[in-house]
Amino acid sequence: MNDAKKYIVSVLILLVAGMFGGCIKEDYSDCPRPFRLTVRAWDADMQDITETGAVQRVVIFVFDETGRRIDRLMMDAAQVAARKPIPLEYDGPTTVSFVAWANPDDHMLEETANVQNVKDLFFRLSSTDGIAQSPGDLFSGVLTCPIEYGSIEQGTDQTVDIYRRTAQVHIIIRGYQEWLEANGPRQLPDYADILLGETPDTYTGLAELIGNAVQYRPDGQIQNGDFISPIIRVYPTLDTTPLHLKLYAYGQELLNISTGSDGVPFIPVIGKMLNIYIDLRGANLNVLVSVTPWDVVQQYAEY
């Protein structure tokens, strides 16, 4: 075999090796084993909800043992619901950490797109003048696992479990229109306001609450004189501090409520619905508070 043929054969061998194995070395002792990663979602009652469609998209940041970002992965709703594994192979690190966040809004994705270190990863609510936009149905989770070396055979499959990071709130205020009218003439557009707060506005990538205090404006509708809010989502409070629901009229805070009539505080529970019912009719203020499963609004008797 002449030199030209030997060269061609050598090149072909290298190409074939590259096709069937990601590691081209004299032996496999330093080769990382490929593996697959899946995402699994849980609700607050530890029920597997991966296939329900609750997760619309997931961004997964991959960090090495020093906290340096080495990869960024995206999954859509169909991939998550089908439990589709992502094939991966990382040569170099001894361990990797997968930091997964589900359902971030476009603003959050843009803010985190160029993060290069885990300590710089934050999921911050959009806000104006201390009033935050309600977050999406956020989930997150972290998985740290070793990188297996010494073979090109398939390594151990891995699963990153993600959990809800927000609470839901639903508000009903009976007699709201009459209460407003009793507190002065109606002067649009800013004659009244309802604010709920306060919570931190930021999660770290590792799901620790930090940042500035913000409130939320539960823009609802007045139906038959009653205020009924949509279901809003909020970040949890620090140290189970209760939320305060503040009712304003004509620029003045007229009511500030943080507990039910029985003393139960307005504490948002991650992965649950906080129901606040306020009756402004009659001589005495009546406030009911309850916690129900996610997406389940408490039904109150009409009287």
Curated annotation (Swiss-Prot):
Record note on quaternary structure: FimB is not part of the fimbrium itself, but anchors the fimbrium in the outer membrane. Linear, head-to-tail oligomerization of fimbrial subunits mediates assembly of the fimbrium stalk, while the minor components FimC, FimD and FimE probably form the fimbrium tip. The anchoring subunit FimB limits fimbrium length and is important for solid fimbrium attachment to the outer membrane. In its absence, the major fimbriae become very long and are easily detached from the membrane.
Function: Anchoring subunit of the major fimbriae. Regulates fimbrial length. These filamentous pili are attached to the cell surface; they mediate biofilm formation, adhesion onto host cells and onto other bacteria that are part of the oral microbiome. Fimbriae of P.gingivalis are major virulence factors.
Residues making up the signal peptide according to the UniProt record: 1-22
Lipidation (S-diacylglycerol cysteine): 23
Identification of the protein by name: Major fimbrium anchoring subunit FimB
Membrane-protein topology: Lipid-anchor
GO CC entries: cell outer membrane
Protein's cellular compartments: Cell outer membrane
Keyword terms, alphabetized: Cell outer membrane, Lipoprotein, Membrane, Palmitate, Signal
Note: The name (major fimbrium subunit) does not indicate the abundance of the protein, but is derived from the greater length of the major fimbriae. In strain ATCC 33277 and strain ATCC BAA-1703 / FDC 381, major fimbriae are 300 - 1600 nM in length and about 5 nm in diameter. In contrast, minor fimbriae are only about 80 - 120 nm long. This length difference is observed only in a small number of strains, including strain ATCC 33277 and strain ATCC BAA-1703 / FDC 381, and is due to a loss of function mutation in FimB, a protein that restricts fimbrial length in other strains.
Family membership noted in the UniProt record: Belongs to the bacteroidetes fimbrillin superfamily. FimB/Mfa2 family.
Lipidation (N-palmitoyl cysteine): 23
Domain of life: Bacteria
